[in-house]
Structures are given as structure tokens and as C-alpha cells.
């Protein structure tokens, strides 16, 4: 089953934290979920050049806390923090609530699956050869410290008349092992011949085996203690 399901959803609540952390009554849930979608779509559309890998949202009664994980935080913050203040005002206008914005820098963007997928999509839009792009991307990701990489392209590759899939794998990719930290990213390349889907899986290693929820954050399920049997 781990071969088919989204690796992030497969691990969410067990070894991966939820990207949206809040509680709402049933009648308000739909509206708040739509707000989260609007925030993520707005950030991806306006700050594509900022290399945002993940957007986390936390809600309290008084405010909405938005945490941006970016490889280029300077693009979001701007000179003397002017850009981030403008962005905070835009988010408050979009949501109609007070917004607390926080920007965190990603230490190793080369092994972030979403950023790798977006980089491949940008190269395909610029008419780069897809096989050469796959080879270079896999080499750079493995050199950055990844334990394994899997990339799949789907569409009219190389301008071919018929769409097809091209897949390339390096290293280990234990998708069914929940202890394995598998990052997943997806992006679409809008080429002249049509859309090309880019899927990327990156094996970032194993979670701590004896952590007993040391890796889990608030809202996650801790590791259960071993059951003792009495004779």
C-alpha cells in the first residue's frame, strides 16, 4: 500500500506533523479549510521565486499563525523587513483576521522534494533535455546527503506526439517503512506542448528508533510502549 499512497499523508500524525494545526466546530470547519487553501495558493503563486517548501498554519481564537519554510527567506523579508510587513497586511486582508507571520530558512534545500520538483519543472519549461535534467538532479540530490531519490515525469516528454512516463531511481526508497523519512513533492511544467507532471520522492534517512515520540510534535501520536505479558 505504501507504493501507491502519498508518502506524506501515509506518515502524517505518526512521524510527520500536521501542516494545519487547529480545531473548529463542524459548521466552521469548511470555511477555515478553504482559508488554508487560499493562503497556500497565494504564497505559491506570488512567491514562487522564494522556494517555499512548506506552509504551516496554526490558529487560535485571536489570530492565525503562518509559518513559511523557505530556501530564500530574503525574497520574502525584503530590505529592512518591508516586504514581510506588506505580505502580512495582504494575508490579513485575504483572511479578515489578524495574522502572525514567521519565516524559517531551510538548511538543505537540495533534499526538499517540493523544491527539487519545482526546479525540474523550471528546467523543462526552458526546453532542457529531460533525461539530462533527471540525471543531474539525482546526482546533486544524492551528493547533498539524500539516502535515495525517485523521480517520475509524465506527459509529452521531448515534444513527442504521444504522452508517456519516464522514471529514474537512485539509492534506497522504502516507501512502506513508516520510520523512513520520505519527502514527497509534485509540480507541473507548463510547456508549449502541454503540461508535464513532475513527482519527486526523497529518502532523507530514518527517524530516531528509540525516540519514543522525540521526533513528534504537538498533535502527533507518540510511540506506544512495548506490551508486557504475564505468565
Positions of the model-derived regions?
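RNA-contacting regions in translation and RNA-metabolism proteins
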Residues: 1-231
Amino acid at each position: 500500500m505504501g507504493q501507491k499512497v502519498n508518502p506524506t499523508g501515509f506518515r502524517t500524525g505518526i512521524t510527520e506533523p500536521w501542516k494545519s494545526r487547529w480545531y473548529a466546530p463542524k459548521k466552521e470547519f469548511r470555511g477555515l479549510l478553504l482559508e488554508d487553501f487560499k493562503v497556500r495558493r497565494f504564497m505559491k503563486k506570488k512567491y514562487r521565486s522564494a522556494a517555499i517548501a512548506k506552509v504551516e498554519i496554526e490558529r487560535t481564537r485571536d489570530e492565525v499563525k503562518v509559518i513559511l519554510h523557505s530556501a530564500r527567506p530574503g525574497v520574502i523579508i525584503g530590505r529592512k523587513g518591508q516586504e514581510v510587513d506588506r505580505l502580512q497586511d495582504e494575508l490579513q486582508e485575504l483572511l479578515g483576521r489578524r495574522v502572525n507571520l514567521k519565516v524559517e530558512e531551510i538548511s538543505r534545500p537540495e533534499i526538499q522534494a517540493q523544491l527539487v520538483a519545482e526546479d525540474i519543472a523550471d528546467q523543462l519549461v526552458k526546453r532542457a533535455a529531460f533525461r539530462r535534467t533527471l540525471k543531474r538532479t539525482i546526482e546533486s540530490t544524492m551528493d547533498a546527503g539524500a539516502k535515495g531519490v525517485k523521480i517520475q515525469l509524465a506527459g509529452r516528454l521531448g515534444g513527442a506526439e504521444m504522452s508517456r512516463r519516464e522514471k529514474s531511481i537512485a539509492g534506497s526508497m522504502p516507501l512502506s517503512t513508516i520510520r523512513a523519512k520520505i519527502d514527497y513533492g509534485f509540480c507541473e511544467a507548463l510547456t508549449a506542448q502541454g503540461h508535464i507532471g513532475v513527482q519527486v520522492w526523497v529518502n532523507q534517512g530514518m527517524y530516531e528508533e528509540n525516540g519514543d515520540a522525540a521526533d513528534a510534535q504537538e498533535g502527533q501520536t507518540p510511540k506506544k510502549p512495548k506490551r508486557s505479558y504475564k505468565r
